[in-house]
Amino acid sequence: MSTEIKTQVVVLGAGPAGYSAAFRCADLGLETVIVERYNTLGGVCLNVGCIPSKALLHVAKVIEEAKALAEHGIVFGEPKTDIDKIRTWKEKVINQLTGGLAGMAKGRKVKVVNGLGKFTGANTLEVEGENGKTVINFDNAIIAAGSRPIQLSFIPHEDPRIWDSTDALELKEVPERLLVMGGGIIGLEMGTVYHALGSQIDVVEMFDQVIPAADKDIVKVFTKRISKKFNLMLETKVTAVEAKEDGIYVTMEGKKAPAEPQRYDAVLVAIGRVPNGKNLDAGKAGVEVDDRGFIRVDKQLRTNVPHIFAIGDIVGQPMLAHKGVHEGHVAAEVIAGKKHYFDPKVIPSIAYTEPEVAWVGLTEKEAKEKGISYETATFPWAASGRAIASDCADGMTKLIFDKESHRVIGGAIVGTNGGELLGEIGLAIEMGCDAEDIALTIHAHPTLHESVGLAAEVFEGSITDLPNPKAKKK
């Protein structure tokens, strides 16, 4: 059976970027259709990414906090985990949110077509679904087809004990020994979950630090904590993976490589993601896709074909949901005739580990590469009353300032709920605030977020909660 639809806008993909674009189009009065290959809206982020991982990380945090309270006189019994119930709760979280999206799509009169969509021309798209083909004739298209985990040719990915992030989030079992390939955000978050549930975690990372994009001083604080839980093998890489009946045997080389192949019950491959640009027949619409699968766009998110836009992971790094959402808004507004551009000063990044590692704006490495003369100011949480009282005094807040203008150009936080504290720094950079603006803003006490104001005071030389190196000498 084949049906045909005519619409002003078709959005290919219903992740955060896609559904945000579609809903914004509808709000601006445009007739809109979403094409989504899966049965629910929300994409990777909501179904097999950001949201389920946070649900499981919440479970992990509660388990770890319960253990830590023994040092303060509150002793719980050894936690008993029911994997089936944890999985059910995770699915409940997902279903609540996907159900909400379905309701909003219906309320906005956005039509959803389920199936795999591919271009057949500059203004046509064909969707292959369970109930047959749907041909969509469109005036404008927004490509939001996302990305998928990288696979390596020497790894037997067909073996069910070789996981990607989606497999890890299914929580089918808790392996006794789990190897995480890749010391990035996804791998470390999943390692955090499975360690709390009882797995022995090894992490192999080819660079000299985990979370390579973040500054070394911030990562150092994080590494000190997780080294007590994980076996970190830095400056090391996997060279061979062999699936045997009794386990997955992994050979490594490098600074921390074991001399012999190691046996694991499961291996999580978390070495990055690749865009889905080559899976759409975009060339039939005249859209240029590069060798890696990315689609190049201008600041209005237009591709080389003016009425076809692209947003989210498929247009390049950083592959983050919040970036895609803003791109979706801009694309929708441009289609509606507004002269809008996607030109953010900053895009925040967060590893939702324990402790969390969060940064926004320029890192020190990036400032050096750009030739910017800068100065940093750091406030250690060991001097924070709230951090000490909350047993998280190993955290740190760092601000990076332009040396001449004193404007904040970057910042990072490592510590409990660091990601929740990052917003002020992002807003300060976006609004062009200098150190004095932040230092003179009265922050509530005792809080963790006052560490941002105190770091600015360190730079200004007005700090009284620490020894002041800028104080006048007597």
Predicted regions and their residues:
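Glycine-rich dinucleotide-binding loop and its adjacent helix/turn
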Residues: C50, A145-Q200, V204, L232, ...
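Glycine-rich flavin
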Residues: S2-T7, A17, F23-E31, E36-V174, ...
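Flexible, glycine-rich terminal cap/loop adjacent to redox cofactors
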Residues: V10-A21, A26-Y38, V44, I51, ...
